[in-house]
Amino acid sequence: MPSQSNNVITSSTASSSMSSSSNSSDASSTSSSNTNNAHSSNNQFVSGQLNLVGNTHTKINDNYEIISKIGEGISGSVFKAIKKGTEEMVALKNFKGWTEGDRASKEECSLLQQLRHIPYITPVIDIYTNFETSEYIIVFPYFEHDLSGLLSEHRLSIPQVKCYFKQLLEGINEIHNAGVMHRDIKAANLLVNNKGSLFIGDLGTATSYTKRSVFSSKVVTLWYRAPELLLGSTQYGPEIDMWSIGCVLIELVTSRNFLPGSSEQQQLEAICKLCGTPTDEIWPNVSQLQNFNQISHLPVYPSRLRTVFKNFSNDFIELLEGLLTLNPKKRLTAEQALQSPFFTNHPLPFKPENMPGYQPIHVLEAVQKRVQQQQELEQQKKQEEQKKQQEEQKKLEDQKKQEEQKKQEDLLKRQRLLKRQQELKKQQDEQRQQELIKKQQEQEQLRLKVEHEKQRQEQERLRLIQQEQERLKRQQQEHEQRLQREQQQQLNQLQQQKESPLNNSYGKINLKRSLDLVNDIRNYCTSETESEYESDEEDFYTEEEVEDYSSDEEDDYYNAQSNKSLYTPIKAMIQQHNNNQQHQQQYPYSQQQQEPISSNPFLQPPKKQRTASTGFNNNNGNNNNNNNLSTPLTIH
């Protein structure tokens, strides 16, 4: 552009073609998609001067001072400028080139002229043209905001929403009544000022739907594109603008777009999940559309508009359902939408003059601000990620440290447990050893006790043996003493016998015969039976005496024969005894009393004691019981 400083055009062309039309909104609507180009064009444009000559045959730089770039579109860029002398803020839209094939630019200029009577279309202040390069600049009034930039910074109340939305419906209704489809309704193409007025800009894709019936389906920004366009329909009408207006209504109340698809496939899926899946029942012949196979695999979703917007009024939901109807033939028109109770029920819409003012911001500025905010957010996110990574690294280190510490603790615990087990095992071993020692000691004590008991028993046995030996010894001694006494007595008796008269009478009778005589006397005195005598005789004599008796019996016989005059039978002795008793009775004092028979040692009883008969006494017939012979005779 700086090289075109001397080119001029006729003023009639500018005044007749752009007297009441505006296209600054068109540039601002597409600026968000070409931000980098906007920055480069801005630097190039601002660095030079506007050399184009306007209808006054003056240079544009003589009338306007460029301040900043506020938008970028398909056909050109939009700049914020000040009119010199009046300090009036204006918007300059630069069309890069106009060739015979550039139908969009020609149609936009034609539509601006056709729709200049509509108050909701941005008016044209002036136009500057360069015929050699087909470049021209249109001067529009400056609007403080576009709706996208405004919603990015502020949340609107329901009365504000109703005010802006009613103006939008009124403006689009007049455009449709003029037989024109806008085909790019979106928040960035809606311009508002601080007086509360809304204007529709960017007619670059607008076209008349009365002159032809087949159109391109690749129109309207993706987030605001109607489902029939996404399904590939090429026969459509102004109802596509009503779908876009429904999306703008959601954006007005939520300050964000509810259908942000990144591709046509994702956009169709988002529409189906929110508004329901299109079928032939609710939309006849929809399955015949070119791109229907993109949603044929989807389940039949019901509409979720009432669920998602359940916190809003019923009239708002009904209006939204009418605008976002899948079947385009049943979709509300702008005129029908203006009859909605949404605008007559409380809260009522604000009047434009009562709308609050805001700090100026446009979509490019909003985009730049969003980019800056996004960069800040990315930087912040990056810092947070770094911080998070550091925290995670620290956490991992702490976790690793804790794991190592836990391992150390587990190791120490295992060591303590092992040590404890060893100590316990040692204690158990010691306890078992002690028990074993104790058991051995008990066994030893028991053994010692048994041995002691055995020793005691042995000692007792020895003591008893000793006692028995002593007893036997005493008995032996007593026996010997008794034998000695007996021998002494026998000696004494023998001595007495030698001295006794009986011995003189029978001196030649041996001891055996004396014993026989004594036994006969004893048996006679005790009146014992023959059997008793025989038993006593057997008990009385020992074996040696029996042998002596048998050996001496023959000698006695011969001795008795030889000494027959000296042998006196027992009966003779008894007779003599009786005679003596009778003699004593007859002559008691004739002679001195003789000694009793018991004084004779040969008349003593044998070792086995016998009781003397009561009929025999030695007291010369005295019957006194005290003088009876009751003491047994003992032979020593």
Curated annotation (Swiss-Prot):
The residues responsible for catalysis, as annotated, are 184 (proton acceptor)
Return the Acidic residues bias intervals: 529-555
Q: Does the keyword Nucleotide-binding apply?
A: yes
Quickly give the catalysed reaction: L-seryl-[protein] + ATP = O-phospho-L-seryl-[protein] + ADP + H(+); L-threonyl-[protein] + ATP = O-phospho-L-threonyl-[protein] + ADP + H(+)
Give an example GO biological process. Answer: positive regulation of transcription elongation by RNA polymerase II
Which Gene Ontology terms of cellular component type are present? Answer: cyclin/CDK positive transcription elongation factor complex; nucleus
InterPro entries reported for this sequence: CDK, Kinase-like_dom_sf, Prot_kinase_dom, Protein_kinase_ATP_BS, Ser/Thr_kinase_AS
Protein name from the UniProt record: Probable cyclin-dependent serine/threonine-protein kinase DDB_G0278487
- Phylogenetic lineage: Eukaryota, Amoebozoa, Evosea, Eumycetozoa, Dictyostelia
